[in-house]
């Protein structure tokens, strides 16, 4: 029986890692230059881990790693660009096996967000140690509310060309992330690599004027970056979660969330569709140059 985890919504990353020695552990953290990514990197590094910090721009990663000031290797990696991913993965390979990979929530719209994660995580998973390695993938709040359209919404309009609603398709991307983690955990089970997804909370990166207004009002009631980083830090490094895999986590606890997250058949279908889409998208070098898939052109939003 799994032991109770004595942490919750108010816990911080430093608290969940108190007393955990991460010396000689090598961990990749994406989106390391701000918010939850920076807080996760800081906490893991403070406990002795060697952090490989990824940001879309090398100078952003360098600035973040310099500010954190411990054992850190900054790398630039634009997950929507094939060459950038290739270079980053090759650099990481040269540093040695990974003990954990933490994929934080990004600012990209549905297809770019999910497919970029799909490709990057699959590439990095080859570098994760068997038996003890961990992969942790972030999912935003909207994944809890998007399931009312049913599973067809995951496949019939992947890019949102026919009806574009930022919250709806952001949520669809994050549900896809949770399903991806579920299927990846199944595929890596034989290697002994644990894969879990977690709720990032509001990232503060959504870009419409209305969304920014809402965020300005609610930011006083939301968790701090250190509190939001508690769950990924727990999943990446705590001995309390050894052997736990394929689960969705929120506030340092396992959470059912959207029931579609447990649909193994849907997870397999999405994996197959994602693999085909990724082959098309990365065949052109960048996401924005990708050909159409299921008669929908690829759309991303990074502004």
Spans of features found by a protein language model:
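C-terminal helical subdomain
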Residues: 173, 197, 216-257, 264-266, ...
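A glycine/serine/threonine-rich, flexible loop-to-helix segment
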Residues: 151-154, 204-218
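Flexible, glycine- and charge-enriched loops at secondary-structure boundaries
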Residues: 78, 110, 114, 221, ...
């Amino acid at each position: 029986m799994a032991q109770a985890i004595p942490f919750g919504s108010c816990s911080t990353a430093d608290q969940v890692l108190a007393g955990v020695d991460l010396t000689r552990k090598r961990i990749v953290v994406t989106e390391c230059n701000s918010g939850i990514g920076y807080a996760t990197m800081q906490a893991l590094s403070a406990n002795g881990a060697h952090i490989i910090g990824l940001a879309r721009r090398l100078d952003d990663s360098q600035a973040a790693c310099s500010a954190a000031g411990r054992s850190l290797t900054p790398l630039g990696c634009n997950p929507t660009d094939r060459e950038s991913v290739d270079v980053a993965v090759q650099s990481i390979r040269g540093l040695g096996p990974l003990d954990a990979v933490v994929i934080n929530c990004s600012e990209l719209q549905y297809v770019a967000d999910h497919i970029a994660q799909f490709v990057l995580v699959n590439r990095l998973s080859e570098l994760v140690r068997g038996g003890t390695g961990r992969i942790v993938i972030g999912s935003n709040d909207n994944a809890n509310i998007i399931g009312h359209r049913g599973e067809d919404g995951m496949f019939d309009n992947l890019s949102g060309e026919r009806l574009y609603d930022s919250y709806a398709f952001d949520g669809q991307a994050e549900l896809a992330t949770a399903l991806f983690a579920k299927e990846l955990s199944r595929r890596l089970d034989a290697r002994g690599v644990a894969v879990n997804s977690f709720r990032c909370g509001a990232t503060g990166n959504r870009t419409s004027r209305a969304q920014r207004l809402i965020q300005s009002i609610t930011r006083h009631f939301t968790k701090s970056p250190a509190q939001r980083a508690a769950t990924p830090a727990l999943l990446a490094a705590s001995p309390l979660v050894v052997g736990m895999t394929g689960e969705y986590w929120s506030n340092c606890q396992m959470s059912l969330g959207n029931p579609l997250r447990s649909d193994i058949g849907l997870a397999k279908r999405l994996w197959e569709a994602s693999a085909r889409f990724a082959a098309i998208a990365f065949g052109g070098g960048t996401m924005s140059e990708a050909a159409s898939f299921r008669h929908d052109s690829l759309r991303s939003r990074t502004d």
